A protein has these predicted regions:
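Gly/Ser-rich phosphate-binding catalytic loop and adjacent alpha/beta segment
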Residues: 1-26
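Active-site/ligand-binding loops adjacent to catalytic centers
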Residues: 3, 19, 31, 83-154, ...
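Hydrophobic/aromatic beta-strand patches that form the interior of the parallel beta-sheet core
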Residues: 7, 33-35, 66, 92, ...
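Active-site/ligand-binding-proximal alpha/beta "capping" segment
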Residues: 29-69, 78-81, 123, 135-150
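Glycine-rich beta-alpha junction loops
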Residues: 39-42, 70-73, 95-100, 109, ...
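Short, well-ordered alpha-helices that flank and scaffold nucleotide-derived cofactor binding pockets
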Residues: 57, 80, 84, 164-168
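Short glycine/serine/threonine-rich phosphate/pyrophosphate-binding segments
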Residues: 68-79, 155-163, 186
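Conserved active-site loop/cleft motifs that coordinate metal ions or position small ligands
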Residues: 151-154, 174-180
Length: 209
């Protein structure tokens, strides 16, 4: 549409391969602009300046904040803001098990740690991580549609699953989780229509990272 050249990278490398290729191109062509959402400080700052204050304004009684671990921008930006308002707020990251795939999320033990996570002292900021499997993510994605009328994506279902796990572990509290993507991106995956076994198998074949 805009005359841009599309540069493909090996599918087996997932988005990590695309990021590495983009980094190499940025070095080769310093006059080009590489936004780099995994490293660009504007990512967490957007959440520090907007999402965090909105949550605090609407839910000042928040005790736990749950979000998926992708670029880590949401967790770092919102998390830092909430901690500055109330140091007792617990910050929980949601990630898939090592070797399993949930779209939009990553397990830090798989070798790629987003620069934002390191630059914003993510290891110190987070209280804990909750592991959510692909099947749980799809189940919760369907619940969001069927029970709440929210057409969200699979990583949003994972965040809901993580929030429910947190809720099962505490006696009382106020948990906020982030619906971070839209369902329109997953219409071809069968996540909303296939039986769960088929939907899970399809999700496992898609390489995101």
């Amino acid at each position: 549409m805009f005359g841009a050249e599309i540069i493909l990278t090996p599918g087996g490398e997932g988005s990590n391969g695309a990021v590495k290729r983009a980094e190499a191109l940025a070095k080769e062509h310093p006059e080009w602009c590489f936004m780099h959402q995994y490293q660009n400080d504007a990512n967490p700052m957007a959440h520090y300046n907007t999402t965090g204050p909105e949550i605090w304004r609407d839910v000042p009684e928040i005790t736990h904040f749950v979000a998926g671990l992708g670029t880590s921008g949401t967790l770092m930006g919102v998390g830092r803001y909430l901690r500055e308002q109330n140091a007792a707020v617990k910050l929980i990251a949601v990630e898939p098990p090592l070797g399993e795939r949930v779209e939009g999320l990553r397990n830090l033990d798989e070798g790629y740690i987003p620069p934002i996570f390191g630059n914003w002292d993510g290891a110190k900021l987070l209280d804990r991580k909750r592991v959510v499997r692909p099947r749980e993510s799809i189940e919760m994605t369907r619940r969001l549609v069927q029970e709440c009328g929210i057409f969200a994506g699979i990583s949003s279902g994972a965040s809901l699953a993580g929030a429910i796990k947190v809720a099962s572990e505490i006696e009382e509290g106020t948990i906020v989780f982030i619906v971070c993507d839209g369902g329109w991106k997953y219409l071809s995956t069968g996540a909303y229509t296939d039986d769960l076994d088929a939907a899970e198998a399809a999700a496992e074949k898609i390489i995101y990272f």
